Amino acid sequence: MATQIEKIKQLREETAAGMMDVKRALEESGGDLDGARRILKERGQAIAAKKSRRETHEGRIEAYVHFNGRVGVLVEVNCETDFVARTPEFREFCRDIALHIASMKPLCVAPEDVPEEALAEEREIAEKQAAEMGKPEHITRQIVEGRLKKWVSEQALLTQPFAKDPGKTVGELLQETVSKVGENVVIRRFVRYEL
């Protein structure tokens, strides 16, 4: 029985899920920790998807200025209530996002927000590079689309690998935060300055 309690404690620390949720996930997975983690992650994503339709009118504007004073970031992160906006988890998330923006230099929040001019310029570069390969046209088209898709994912904040943990994207970190705080959280906008 002690091993079951230890597993519950371990999963609660790792996932920040409630005790009953952890207990149910362990039961469903037959006591398998990896299976329980997977179940909790799926439930967290389902909760995040459900909450994503809720309006967010509260939040924080987080400021970060690099120690040398040459890089600065302002990011607006919204949530549903001022109570959540004051929690340490939410504040840490905002700080992490500001630090990520300072180091990774995204152009926009979501892939669909990538400026058309930048996309057209990148498409032109990719087409020239693909044409130099001497491949058939349909393969060249696929190469261009693949390179553009990769480039867009590197430029949009939500699809970038998270700077502190490259094993997950900023979007996945956002979903984890939604499941931790129990409210919808939205990265609304940001601005990055560099001398």
Curated annotation (Swiss-Prot):
Keyword Lipid biosynthesis assigned: no
Involved in Mg(2+) ion dislocation from EF-Tu, as annotated region: 81-84
Localization, UniProt: Cytoplasm
Lineage of origin: Bacteria, Bacillati, Actinomycetota, Rubrobacteria, Rubrobacterales
Gene3D superfamilies membership: 1.10.286.20, DNA helicase RuvA subunit, C-terminal domain, Elongation factor Ts, dimerisation domain
Protein name per Swiss-Prot or TrEMBL: Elongation factor Ts
Superkingdom of the organism of origin: Bacteria
Matching CDD domains: UBA_EF-Ts (cd14275)
Keyword set, alphabetical order: Cytoplasm, Elongation factor, Protein biosynthesis
Organism: Rubrobacter xylanophilus (strain DSM 9941 / JCM 11954 / NBRC 16129 / PRD-1)
Subcellular location, principal: cytoplasm
